[in-house]
Regions:
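Conserved N-terminal beta1-alpha1 strand-loop-helix module at the mouth
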Residues: 1-207
Length: 207
């Protein structure tokens, strides 16, 4: 099975057009106001006006309330919700039930990560994204030791955290994840994508 690819942190329409033309599976938009890659709900709608069918549009939320998520989802064409803050597993399940949309929950990996808990909820949500245990919520460029990931979970998870053109091939050979998610590793600057890095990243994923 091929590895799916999500590019995250878009702020500019030309970057989106390039990513779509290259064949990316999913586009991520950061709806967290404290992020340098933040875009408003209205801006997401504008940016996605010409995104074709079957490209998944993912909205990244950080510690938002259910009413806040509901309000934002009433505007742009977000098809998947990504919870990237300190949300509980039960909150993620509740959002999935209320919104009736796929929900991905991010887990910041550290030596205390409860892998039994991850395994328990992995099949109840639409995806679990593994990221570095950074002080910021995503897009830090920090990585983590893939050796922490139990072998029985590797083919089901979304791998993130410090991925780049230089290491994504090794990541796939080592982990064989369901999908990979990258933001800073394909950028010129925060929110500004590099067309050549996007091309090379996809090329190395798809081999």
């Amino acid at each position: 099975m091929r590895t799916r690819v999500k590019f995250c942190g878009f702020t500019r329409e030309p970057d989106i057009q390039i990513a779509v033309a290259l064949g990316v599976d999913a586009l991520g938009f950061v709806l967290y106001e404290k992020s340098p890659r933040y875009v408003s709900a209205e801006r997401v709608a504008q940016l996605c006006a010409h995104v074709p069918a079957f490209v998944n549009i993912v909205g990244l939320f950080v510690n938002s309330t259910v009413p806040q998520i509901t309000r934002i989802l009433s505007k742009p064409p977000i098809s998947t919700i990504q919870l990237h803050g300190d949300e509980s597993w039960n909150f993620a399940l509740n959002v999935k039930k209320i919104m009736q949309r796929p929900v991905i929950k991010a887990v910041r990996v550290n030596p205390q990560t409860d892998w039994d808990e991850v395994a328990h909820y992995l099949d109840q949500l639409s995806g679990v994204l593994l990221d570095a245990d950074s002080s910021v919520y995503g897009g830090s460029g920090d990585g983590f030791d893939w050796g922490h990931i139990p072998s029985e979970l590797r083919g089901k998870i979304i791998l993130s955290g410090g991925l780049s053109v230089d290491n994504v091939k090794n990541a796939i050979d080592t982990v064989a994840p369901y999908a990979v998610d990258v933001s800073s590793g394909i950028e010129l600057s925060k929110g500004v994508k590099d067309a050549e890095k996007m091309r090379l990243f996809l090329e190395r994923v798809r081999g």
